[in-house]
């Protein structure tokens, strides 16, 4: 309850995305919520269609966010093998977009288990330092949580699509049986407006 202030080094214009990545991979931020089981992260470019929050809390999962669904062509030969080889041959400190195919947890609108994430920030301290030293979008904090820890209890891609959409909107819509999720992240981005304008009032979109 109430408000808590955090350092400008974390949030604001000083360090921008880098500061945000640092805050969301620090045990200190999760310690602010020690009295709570879950932390719901809701960024300012989120549109919420309904409140299903208790349903997700009752599932007992560790993390849920918009999924990165895998197109059917990447699930079969030869594209499946091609992507596997591409990942195997990449430089150690480089992430590829295809590594997020079939992963859970876009950070714009997500639910995280507080105590577990606080402990994981400590357990993976060295890996986190490496990620935060590499300033490219494929090393953002939500990419870290999607790719590095292996012990997270996650929903299926189909379940996560009922929580939120972020990318591959038509595919997410199909996976979710042509129904809307609880929320949309990044709904007002120019290249997503065509999809979301069917469901969100035009007044909600920034003038572009």
Question: What spans do the regions from the language model cover?
Answer:
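Active-site-proximal specificity loops/subdomain of glycosyltransferases
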Residues: 1-37
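Catalytic core and acceptor-binding pocket of nucleotide-sugar-dependent glycosyltransferases
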Residues: 91-208
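Alpha-helical elements of Rossmann-like donor-binding domains used by nucleotide-donor carbohydrate transfer enzymes
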Residues: 25-28, 55, 63, 116, ...
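Short beta-strand-to-loop acidic/aromatic patch adjacent to the donor-nucleotide binding site
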Residues: 36-49
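Pol beta-like nucleotidyltransferase catalytic core
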Residues: 20-22, 76-82, 109, 193, ...
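Conserved donor-nucleotide/metal-binding helix-loop-beta segment in metal-dependent transferases, i.e.
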Residues: 46-90
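A generic local structural motif
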Residues: 24-28, 50-52, 96-97
């Amino acid at each position: 309850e109430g408000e808590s202030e955090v350092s400008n080094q974390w949030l604001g214009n000083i360090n921008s995305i880098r500061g945000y990545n640092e805050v969301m991979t620090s045990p200190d931020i999760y310690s602010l919520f020690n009295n709570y089981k879950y932390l719901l992260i809701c960024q300012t470019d989120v549109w919420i269609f309904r409140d299903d929050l208790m349903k997700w809390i009752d599932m007992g999962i560790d993390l849920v966010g918009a999924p990165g669904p895998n197109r059917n062509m990447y699930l079969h030969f030869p594209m499946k093998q091609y992507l596997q080889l591409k990942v195997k041959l990449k430089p150690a400190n480089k992430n590829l977009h295809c590594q997020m195919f079939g992963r859970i947890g876009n950070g714009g609108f997500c639910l995280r288990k507080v105590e577990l994430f606080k402990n994981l920030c400590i357990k993976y301290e060295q890996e986190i330092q490496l990620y935060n030293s590499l300033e490219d979008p494929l090393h953002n904090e939500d990419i870290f949580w999607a790719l590095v820890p292996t012990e997270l209890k996650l929903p299926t891609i189909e379940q996560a699509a009922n929580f939120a959409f972020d990318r591959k909107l038509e595919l997410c819509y199909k996976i979710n049986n042509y129904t809307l999720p609880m929320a949309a992240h990044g709904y007002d981005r120019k290249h997503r407006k065509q999809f979301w304008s069917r469901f969100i009032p035009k007044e909600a979109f920034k003038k572009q």
